[in-house]
């Protein structure tokens, strides 16, 4: 098959088109599929010989365009050009004319003399196939300058094939009278003609052009090349042909014979309109100087009456490749045509150079396109151009569209300089760091996000991310870094890290203003009872108040802060003391700190039999941070085994030296049960208060601190407030933290309603919109709008703090994430905490943070005071959470909802039990671990050979030996085998186990290299519940 020849190679060799080669193959009966098909050498020779003979050139090649010669005024022989051009035998019919007139038009066109074609060689093979056989080479570009005159199609020659129509359309050199029919002159350069011919020409040529494509292969070739100029007489009737559809989509219809177009001139016009190429060609005379084949214009006028009546002045475009030399397309509307005619008149007197410039300027105009005859575009490109021109009907659209596009381009260019500036914002901190001569010092106050750290270090976020990436930590811009990781990054970037001194939580706040100095009056002291758990704080307070609060407390421990008033007779006067009772459990650190912050005097209670304990030292640190005087009450001196002197010694070691030892710390030995020395304690409190000269201004809006708060199902949010300055009255508008409220009612610690509360008064307040946070400060405002604005600002700040806290839960550190957490095996336990008061919720959350969370992480979805409601149950069911109720109850329907949805609700009244159960639940989430449990040991005393190996005669040293248990054989301290014990016999009987002190035979299938003295360790693997690693 290597000697076979491809058809396109033959076409290239012969200098012809593939289509011509395919036609020859079809004529010779040579089978083929496409131009890439192969044929035998013999068949190739036949094709070459056939191609070398004169052949009919089909008008399907639109790309070959003979160039017009502006100088030639005489007819030129269209020998090859004629063949190359598609002879468009279209009889232009202005109006529906009878078939006889169409036939007459066809005869006139055929008999029409063409002075330009005397040299043409044309031979008519028949009426059906009247096509011209050109003897010249197949390439039609040989005679580009020769512009064939417009060929007139012969109706008789019209056939279904466009080739036959093209052949028949080519007029013979017979000198038929031109007056009978307006002949479409070849490319007549009628630029010299007056402005009138151009005006009429576009009108008359449009119908003719539109008709021309229909009869002969209009579809095969967009003959835009030739520009035919019609006589003025023919052009005048043309204005009637105005609205042929310009859409090029109708071009495929021209395949129909010429007779069909003659039958309906209107339909022909519609078909012709899609071919904007024809219209462009007809405008040629005014725009391009084309050689005039027929110099006498009067001849054209007599042609009309002789050959065709005025009703049918449609010029017959014999030559299919009529170039749209004057592509002055007449639009469908009459107004557009008038505008085009005016434009033609203005351009008629311009020079050739001006025409070229105007053509470039008017490319966007669909109306006029001036083409220079010397610059002839290819037929394909011209066809595409003409197809696009009619689509842009509004002449102003293209130009109006282009300027905005051009204007849009500079805009992005102008914006581009801004983008670098925007992107430079990321690197701006670096530049600022370089320009600032400040020291590279980072004040690290806690965990930071990557973005915040980059801003403080004045570097780009990408620099931080890159530095961490090299450390093996992948972070995002919003991820939170712990202090150690942020410190390492800062040091690597050359910064010195400093940490601010931690401000104590119990630091006392100043509530007096300068304007209060002139209105100060003495106020009662606020005394906070502090100490370790079970040292008798509440019992001591009950003994002072003559109450029994301690007996009503769950578990006998205080788990909430309380405020009480006590009236004492001192030096013949009634003196009031406000006591704050704080819990002693380690989880209630915040409560103790809050009590120390608002107190005036701290009473440190220490049990004489227990001495100084951790919470004693913590309370001491809070009191010192608040810089308040300390009074030590050594309690339980009546208890056997009490050692008050040892307690004083311990306190002295921590900086509290008793007054009797030469110190400045008052110490009173008391007994709450026997009420011993209680008066001495109260007297000491009042003496210290007098020394401190406690004062306040009662004639100002109240200010103070929220001691405790809770949600009451009947009364709503209830807050215990300590008024530290000013006077609080019913009806006042106040802001407590971020909560707005109006005082609806006030009650003291005994439940009596009050209308006002002065300085150092502890009251329960009703009327707040929400439950405030314990420890928040409150202030009364005269303007409610101002109060609401302040509350909203604080609420927004609180939301941001919560968001920061949520980010902290996703913080990244180098050592806090365990390997299992990195592998996605970190367990999570979701919790919903409901307590009686807000302080208890805070204490529980603080205690949860102390639990180890490297393998099981605790997520507190909600922690708030109040009852357990159905909403809480729904949240727990949706998030698979556990509800922890602390000293609270169920709302109506909540317990039933929890049972229906299977929500686990745990109720507690002692914080110890809550934390113990929570730790157990966390351990339950851990996967149990397998541990080795030893069973016994045996020593090999004798090796007994058997047929299948050897058996170890052993003596059980300790424990027991079980069959199928795991064994480890040690020889001189090294393990020589580890596997399973398969056979265990005592004498000749199989036994399940052998106890210590007995002999037995041990056999293992996969091991028989026993030696005397080997030690056999018997053990088993058991699963054991894991416990949380210490934090």
UniProtKB/Swiss-Prot annotation:
| Biased composition regions of type Pro residues, renumbered to the chain | 184-200, 286-299
Q: At which positions is GTP bound?
A: 531-538, 581-585, 635-638
For bias type Low complexity, the affected ranges are 96-105, 148-171, 419-435
One Pfam family, short name: IF2_N
**tr-type G domain segment(s):** 522-695
Region listing for Disordered, in residue ranges: 33-369, 388-436
Q: Which UniProt keywords apply?
A: Cytoplasm, GTP-binding, Initiation factor, Nucleotide-binding, Protein biosynthesis
Question: Per the record, which residues fall in region G2?
Answer: 556-560
List, as start-end ranges, the regions of compositional bias called Basic and acidic residues: 45-56, 250-281
InterPro entries this protein is in?
A: EF-G-like_DII (IPR053905), IF2_II (IPR044145), IF2_N (IPR006847), P-loop_NTPase (IPR027417), Small_GTP-bd (IPR005225), T_Tr_GTP-bd_dom (IPR000795), TF_IF2_bacterial-like (IPR000178), TIF_IF2 (IPR015760)
Q: Give a yes or no for keyword Protein biosynthesis in this entry.
A: yes
Could you give a GO molecular-function term held by this entry? GTP binding
Q: Does the keyword Aminoacyl-tRNA synthetase apply?
A: no
This protein's source sits in the domain of life called Bacteria
Q: Where is this region: G3?
A: 581-584
Q: Which region ranges are annotated with the description G5?
A: 671-673
What segments bear the compositional bias annotation Polar residues? 108-123
Q: What is its main location?
A: cytoplasm
> What functional role does this protein have?
One of the essential components for the initiation of protein synthesis. Protects formylmethionyl-tRNA from spontaneous hydrolysis and promotes its binding to the 30S ribosomal subunits. Also involved in the hydrolysis of GTP during the formation of the 70S ribosomal complex.
* Family, similarity comment: Belongs to the TRAFAC class translation factor GTPase superfamily. Classic translation factor GTPase family. IF-2 subfamily.
Its recorded name reads Translation initiation factor IF-2
- UniProt source species: Synechococcus sp. (strain JA-3-3Ab)
Which gene does this sequence derive from?
infB
């Amino acid at each position: 098959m290597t000697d076979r020849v491809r058809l396109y190679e033959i076409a290239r060799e012969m200098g012809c088109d593939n289509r011509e080669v395919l036609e020859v193959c079809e004529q010779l009966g040579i089978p083929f599929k496409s131009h890439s098909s192969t044929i035998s050498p013999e068949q190739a020779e036949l094709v070459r010989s056939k191609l070398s003979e004169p052949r009919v050139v089909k008008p399907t090649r639109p790309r070959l365009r003979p160039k017009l010669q502006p100088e030639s005024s005489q007819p030129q022989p269209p020998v090859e050009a004629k063949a190359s051009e598609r002879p468009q035998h279209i009889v232009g019919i202005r109006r529906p004319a009878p078939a006889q007139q169409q036939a007459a038009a066809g005869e006139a066109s055929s008999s029409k003399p063409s002075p330009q074609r005397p040299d043409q060689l044309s031979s008519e093979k028949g009426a059906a196939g009247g096509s011209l056989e050109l003897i010249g080479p197949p390439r039609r570009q040989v005679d580009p300058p020769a512009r064939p005159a417009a060929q007139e199609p012969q109706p008789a020659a019209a056939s279904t094939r466009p080739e036959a129509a093209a052949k028949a359309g080519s007029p013979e050199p017979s000198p038929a009278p031109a007056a009978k029919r307006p002949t479409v002159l070849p490319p007549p350069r009628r630029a010299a003609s007056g402005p009138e011919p151009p005006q009429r020409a576009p009108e008359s040529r449009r119908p003719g052009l539109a008709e021309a494509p229909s009869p002969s292969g209009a579809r095969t070739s967009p003959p835009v090349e030739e520009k035919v100029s019609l006589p003025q007489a023919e052009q005048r009737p043309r204005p009637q042909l105005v609205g042929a559809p310009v859409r090029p989509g109708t071009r495929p219809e021209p395949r129909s014979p010429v007779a069909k177009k003659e039958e309906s001139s209107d339909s022909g016009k519609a078909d012709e309109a899609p071919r904007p190429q024809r219209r462009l060609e007809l405008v040629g005379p005014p725009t391009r100087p084309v050689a005039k084949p027929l110099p006498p214009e009067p001849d054209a006028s007599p042609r009309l009456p002789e050959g065709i009546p005025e009703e049918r002045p449609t010029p017959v475009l014999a030559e299919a490749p009529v170039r749209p030399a004057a592509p002055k397309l007449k639009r469908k509307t009459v107004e557009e045509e008038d505008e085009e005619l005016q434009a033609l008149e203005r351009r008629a007197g311009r020079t050739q150079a001006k025409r070229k410039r105007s053509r470039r300027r008017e490319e966007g105009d669909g109306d006029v396109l001036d083409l220079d005859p010397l610059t002839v575009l290819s037929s394909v490109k011209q066809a595409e151009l003409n197809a696009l021109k009619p689509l842009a009907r509004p002449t102003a659209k293209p130009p109006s569209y282009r300027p905005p596009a051009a204007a849009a381009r500079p805009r992005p260019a102008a914006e581009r300089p801004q983008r670098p500036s925007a992107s430079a914002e990321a690197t701006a901190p670096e530049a600022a760091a370089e320009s600032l001569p400040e020291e590279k010092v980072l004040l690290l106050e806690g965990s930071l996000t990557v973005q915040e750290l980059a801003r403080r270090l004045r570097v780009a976020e990408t620099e931080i991310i890159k530095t961490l990436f090299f450390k093996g930590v992948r972070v995002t811009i919003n991820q939170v870094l712990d202090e150690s990781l942020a410190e390492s990054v800062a040091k690597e970037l050359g910064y010195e890290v400093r940490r601010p001194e931690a401000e104590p939580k119990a630091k006392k706040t100043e509530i007096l203003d300068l304007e209060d100095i002139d209105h100060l009056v003495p106020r009662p002291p606020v005394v906070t009872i502090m100490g370790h758990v079970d040292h008798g704080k509440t019992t001591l307070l009950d003994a002072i108040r003559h109450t029994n609060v301690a007996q009503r407390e769950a578990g006998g421990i205080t788990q909430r802060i309380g405020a009480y008033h006590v009236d004492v007779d001192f030096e013949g006067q009634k003196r009031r003391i406000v006591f704050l009772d704080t819990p002693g459990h380690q989880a209630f650190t915040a409560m103790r700190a809050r009590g120390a912050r608002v107190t005036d005097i701290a009473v440190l209670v220490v049990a004489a039999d227990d001495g100084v304990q951790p919470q004693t030292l913590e309370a001491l640190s809070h009191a010192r941070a608040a810089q308040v005087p300390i009074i030590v009450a050594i309690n339980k001196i009546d208890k056997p085994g009490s050692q008050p002197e040892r307690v004083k010694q311990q306190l002295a070691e921590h900086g509290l030296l008793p007054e009797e030892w030469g110190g400045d710390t008052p110490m009173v030995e008391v007994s709450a049960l026997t009420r011993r020395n209680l008066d001495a304690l109260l007297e000491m409190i009042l003496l210290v208060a007098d020394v401190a000269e406690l004062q306040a201004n009662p004639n100002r809006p109240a200010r103070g601190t929220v001691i405790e708060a809770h949600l009451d199902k009947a009364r709503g949010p209830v807050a215990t407030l300590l008024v530290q300055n000013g006077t609080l009255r019913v009806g006042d508008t106040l802001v407590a933290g971020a909560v707005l409220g109006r005082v609806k009612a006030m009650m003291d610690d005994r439940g009596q309603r009050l209308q006002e509360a002065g300085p150092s008064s502890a009251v329960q307040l009703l009327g707040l919109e929400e439950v405030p946070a314990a420890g928040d400060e409150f202030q009364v405002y005269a303007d409610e709008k101002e109060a609401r604005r302040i509350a909203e600002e604080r609420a927004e700040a609180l939301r941001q703090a919560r968001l920061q806290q949520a980010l902290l839960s996703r913080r990244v550190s180098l050592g806090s994430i365990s390997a299992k957490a990195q592998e996605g095996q970190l367990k999570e336990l979701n919790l919903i905490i409901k307590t009686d008061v807000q302080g208890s919720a805070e204490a529980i959350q603080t205690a949860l943070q102390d639990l180890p969370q490297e393998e099981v992480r605790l997520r507190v979805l909600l922690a708030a005071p109040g009852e357990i409601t159905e909403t809480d149950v729904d949240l727990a069911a949706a998030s698979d959470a556990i509800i922890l109720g602390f000293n609270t109850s169920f709302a109506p329907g909540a317990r039933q909802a929890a049972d229906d949805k299977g929500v686990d609700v745990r109720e507690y009244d002692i914080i110890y039990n809550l934390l113990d159960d929570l730790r157990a639940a966390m351990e339950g989430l851990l996967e149990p671990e397998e541990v080795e449990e030893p069973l016994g040991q045996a020593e090999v005393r004798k090796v007994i050979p058997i047929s299948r190996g050897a058996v170890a005669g052993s003596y059980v040293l300790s424990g027991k030996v079980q069959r199928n248990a795991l064994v480890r054989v040690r020889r001189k301290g090294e393990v020589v085998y580890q596997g399973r014990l398969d056979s265990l016999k005592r004498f000749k009987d199989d036994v399940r186990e052998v106890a210590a002190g007995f002999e037995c035979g041990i056999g293992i299938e996969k091991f028989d290299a026993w030696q005397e003295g080997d030690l056999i360790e018997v053990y088993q693997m058991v699963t054991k519940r894991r416990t949380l690693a210490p934090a």
